[in-house]
Amino acid sequence: MSIEEQQSPITSTQQGLVLGRQKNGVLMFNGIPYAEPPVGDRRFKRPVSPASWDDIRDATRFGPAAPQLPSGGMTDSVPVSWNEDCLFLNVCTPAIDQKKRPVLVWIHGGAYRSGQGAVPWYNGASFALNGDIVVVSINYRLGALGFTDLSRFGDDYATSGINGICDQIKALEWVRDNISGFGGDPSKVTIAGESA
């Protein structure tokens, strides 16, 4: 990969091309949608795969985190907006090549009420650089949007009480289907997290 390609790396996902950035010796792709926005008719429903895009998608900035009550911690001060359209993930990789590195998917904690994948200690740069692995961090629906049981309103809401967990599963499916484009091996995925 040339210096120019390292500064503005582009790779492919099933939905289309994404543009990342180089920072501190690793390649970062942030704010990649792994599901359709859970808004409007999709609110309180199981996540579905995202639609494709034609242009190169800018993946140089983190996507919004799920709406949440301020927790008084560092997640309140990270410069990422909160929005119901929050089903984004971030990929940090040493290189885009055919090496097939192990993958670590980090799921943030916060008692299912707060948190986000954009906090600095979740970005994975140190692991990617020093451990030669690909690191993925995710956002998922929190609080009432992710864990309110509305199943009594019909089959469309059958998963409403566990949609935050369904979001995590959808993110793992995205990793399985797309991580090879980021130098990762979909058969070597480790899931980790804390709290929640």
Please annotate each region the language model reported.
Residues 141-144, 192-196:
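Short, solvent-exposed turn/loop segments enriched in Gly/Ser/Thr/Pro and often Arg
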Residues 109, 163-167, 195-196:
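Active-site loop->helix "elbow" adjoining a glycine-rich segment at hydrolase catalytic centers
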Residues 127, 180-183:
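A general structural signal for stabilizing positions within well-ordered secondary structure
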Residues 1-162:
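Non-catalytic accessory segments of hydrolases
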Residues 102, 175, 182-194:
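Alpha/beta-hydrolase fold nucleophile elbow
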Residues 86, 158-181:
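Alpha/beta-hydrolase active-site loop
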Residues 91, 96, 173, 184-186:
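A ubiquitous, low-specificity "background" feature that marks scattered single residues
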